[in-house]
Amino acid sequence: MTRYFVDTNCLLGLTFINDRWYPDAKRLFDTDNTIYTGKNAVYEYCSSTGDNSRCSADIRLDRDEGLYGEKRAKLRLKLRQFGKMLQTYSDDELDIETVMDVYVDRFDMKESEEKEVRPRLQKYFEWYFEKEGELTRRTAREAARKLKDVLMERSIKHKDQIEARVYLEPMRDREYPDVEKRLKEWPVHMKNNADIALICDAVFLKEEIGISHFVTGDFTDIYSNQDWIHENLGFSVLYLLETFAGEEKPTAGLDLDD
């Protein structure tokens, strides 16, 4: 069975069903392979606060801070704003494209994110308005409220699944100054200390339990240096959106039935 190391984006991608990485992260986590992560990914994911550091934090997957807590707070705020913004339109002005444009605007989506997320969200709204038989200010407001409830509930459920599915042990207990030095020098020139820390976590797990793949959800220095990492550190780097891409099933909106 293959042993994967996943970064923070993979964890967030599975947690939030409106995340651009959700379909691909779900396919990864639905495999029979063993999935590991490291203390630095979990620090970012759910253990960082304004008062702790990577060295001082109590790093556990059952905590609710970090990017997980921040994204949940943002969801609550942005979806409330979304619902209120829809109420500024008359019933005659509302159509599915207008609803989606307001959502994209409220969430400040980048073009790349919009391309991934908008079609899935549009399926949800189309399903909801068809179920209600009309698209009005009332049904738009109710659809926004339902979406908020679903996203919040699923984020809790999926985080529980991550706690049960992902191994944080063994946790790195030593430093890799030589690896850090080589990553910062030519030809890699890696500048992001958080990425370097993630790689060192993966090096540790390569030594301890033989992880073979590092899965990342973003085009970072890690992915752009995949050949060097494979040749020198002994594990391959996989890009989540390429390796686990697939046909999305038609859905009543963001896996409402999962």
Label every PLM stretch briefly:
Residues 211-218:
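Acidic beta-strand-to-loop metal/phosphate-binding motif
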Residues 2-207, 220-258:
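Active-site-proximal, substrate-binding regions of enzyme catalytic domains
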